[in-house]
Amino acid sequence: MYEYLDRRYAVALYNIASAENKVEEYIADLKQINDLIKNNEDLNQIISNPKISTTKKREIFTSIFEDKIDLKLFSFLIILIEKKRIDQLTGIILQIEKVDLDNHNQVVAEVKTVVPLNNSERTALIDKLQIKYNKSIILREVIDKSIIGGVYVRVGDDVIDGTIKNKIEEMKKLMFIKG
């Protein structure tokens, strides 16, 4: 829903981080801050409570983070608080990671199999995906016994589902249509 705005904030922060050569540091810090907000019930309630003033939220963030993270990143978080966007931090992090991948001409491919790919399968898959997307591939392998067999690949919004589970589902649909 807020993807467009999240991307605008992400691009702005990415440009600052890139100029400072701190992209990885900023992403890591943002993830830690986001985890802290999510896992600390008190902080989460303060952030999400519209009755708590922006000034109070800014004071709390200042007391927690001011001297612990880069000043420009801290300023970015304060802007998010003032613009009432701090609750969208997860989406902003996802977008900044996408911007970073785009700028490095990379794409993440999530691959699900029942058993781990061997080296030749992995290399062949990466080669085919690099040709298809004309980008360097970051392969994230997931073992998923529920797919029964075959391979499932997701790159962005593209899905290649060559799993036995999917074939069974397709057969079930055909049986219901004809039956």
Swiss-Prot record:
One function term, GO molecular function aspect: proton-transporting ATP synthase activity, rotational mechanism
InterPro entries: ATP_synth_OSCP/delta_N_sf, ATPase_OSCP/d_CS, ATPase_OSCP/dsu
Subcellular location as annotated: Cell membrane
Entry keywords, A to Z: ATP synthesis, Cell membrane, CF(1), Hydrogen ion transport, Ion transport, Membrane, Transport
Keyword Ion transport: yes
UniProt GO cellular component terms: plasma membrane; proton-transporting ATP synthase complex
Membrane association type: Peripheral membrane protein
Alphabetical list of HAMAP family matching this protein: ATP_synth_delta_bact
Protein task: F(1)F(0) ATP synthase produces ATP from ADP in the presence of a proton or sodium gradient. F-type ATPases consist of two structural domains, F(1) containing the extramembraneous catalytic core and F(0) containing the membrane proton channel, linked together by a central stalk and a peripheral stalk. During catalysis, ATP synthesis in the catalytic domain of F(1) is coupled via a rotary mechanism of the central stalk subunits to proton translocation. This protein is part of the stalk that links CF(0) to CF(1). It either transmits conformational changes from CF(0) to CF(1) or is implicated in proton conduction.
Family affiliation: Belongs to the ATPase delta chain family.
Quaternary assembly: F-type ATPases have 2 components, F(1) - the catalytic core - and F(0) - the membrane proton channel. F(1) has five subunits: alpha(3), beta(3), gamma(1), delta(1), epsilon(1). F(0) has three main subunits: a(1), b(2) and c(10-14). The alpha and beta chains form an alternating ring which encloses part of the gamma chain. F(1) is attached to F(0) by a central stalk formed by the gamma and epsilon chains, while a peripheral stalk is formed by the delta and b chains.
Protein name: ATP synthase subunit delta
